[in-house]
A protein has these predicted regions:
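Ubiquitin-like/PB1-type beta-grasp interaction modules and other compact soluble beta-rich domains
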Residues: 1-64
């Protein structure tokens, strides 16, 4: 299915947000995720079902200076 991930359209096979993170090789509970503009806590990612056209944001912490 086609999803918009961090502003880029991608074709993926994952059915849940947790599966998507695994498919895209994101690991760790330190990630921040949003599904169609709503924050999804780490504990809810496995129950967050994805649908064609959904918008996903995946953010990871960066060192600043």
């Amino acid at each position: 299915m086609k999803l918009t991930i961090n502003g880029e359209t991608r074709d993926v096979s994952a059915a849940t947000l947790a599966a998507l993170l695994k498919e895209l090789d994101y690991v760790g509970n330190w990630l921040a995720t949003a599904h169609n503009g709503e924050v999804v806590p780490a504990k809810e990612r496995s129950s967050c079902r994805l649908s064609e056209g959904d918008r996903i944001e995946i953010l990871s912490p960066m060192k600043g200076g």
